[in-house]
Amino acid sequence: MGVFVAEIRPRWSDMDAFGHVNHANTVTLLEEARVELLFGEGSRHGATAMGNGMVVARLVVDYHTPLVVDGTSVRVEIVVRELRAASFTLDYTVHSGRRESDAVVATAETLLVPYDRVAARPRRLTDAERDFLAGYRAGVRSA
């Protein structure tokens, strides 16, 4: 698998008074890509427990250049940097367009913790979740 790539289309309403996508809306773009990976791809690969609960424990975003809404989608790349028993870290690269060669507008990381909503506490990753996430580890090449 390697790098997960999502194409997300920013909305006109994502822009602020300065004519670029507001920083908070950039976080929403990250969320949309993450949901596609964890709940979309994860479910298709048997990691269905992710849909039961996942919380963001930490979020860091570095903004490199303004992102302007021009009607095209942006490329969001995600890799798993760290995989632990009860948490994992995702790294994101957001490009200004659909191509890998388009300018990088932001990089980010999230620390995610699987969460048992019934018990109201964190839980360990299942074997299926670990196997799925391991396919997106940084440095793993796509087949």
Where are the regions that the model predicts?
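Hydrophobic beta-strand-centered segment that forms part of the acyl-chain substrate-binding groove
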Residues: 37-75, 79-82, 86-88, 105
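HotDog/MaoC-like acyl-thioester-processing domains
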Residues: 6, 68-72, 81-143
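Hot-dog-fold acyl-thioester-processing enzymes
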Residues: 1-58, 117-143
